[in-house]
């Protein structure tokens, strides 16, 4: 169960870090936005290593679904933009795919 906590915290810090770069480079904010960006992205990487998984690629693939959920949440809450129907459909498809990766049977180690 702690995996979900690590995934959601990692997503929060990854999105926050990328958003800080977005604010600096796309919105013309101060270069000081780079400081929280780098701190957030470092925390993202560290948190993702706490996930209990045998293979990094499988952990990252499962994380992708949670990242998309968090991104649509960020869009709605932080940027105050109402997600479109296509956003919700894409989110659902990605969560289904990530669930197959996360909960699917393991027939081999490869």
Swiss-Prot record:
Pfam families recorded: UPF0060 (PF02694)
Keyword Transmembrane helix on entry: yes
Topological type in the membrane: Multi-pass membrane protein
UniProt keyword list: Cell inner membrane, Cell membrane, Membrane, Transmembrane, Transmembrane helix
Transmembrane region(s): 5-25, 31-51, 59-79, 84-104
Major place of residence: membrane
Listed SUPFAM superfamilies: Multidrug resistance efflux transporter EmrE (SSF103481)
Subcellular location(s) of the protein: Cell inner membrane
Top-rank lineage group of the source organism: Bacteria
InterPro entries linked: UPF0060
Gene Ontology CC annotations of this record: plasma membrane
Family of the protein in this entry: Belongs to the UPF0060 family.
Name of the protein in question: UPF0060 membrane protein PFL_4337
Organism in which the protein naturally occurs: Pseudomonas fluorescens (strain ATCC BAA-477 / NRRL B-23932 / Pf-5)
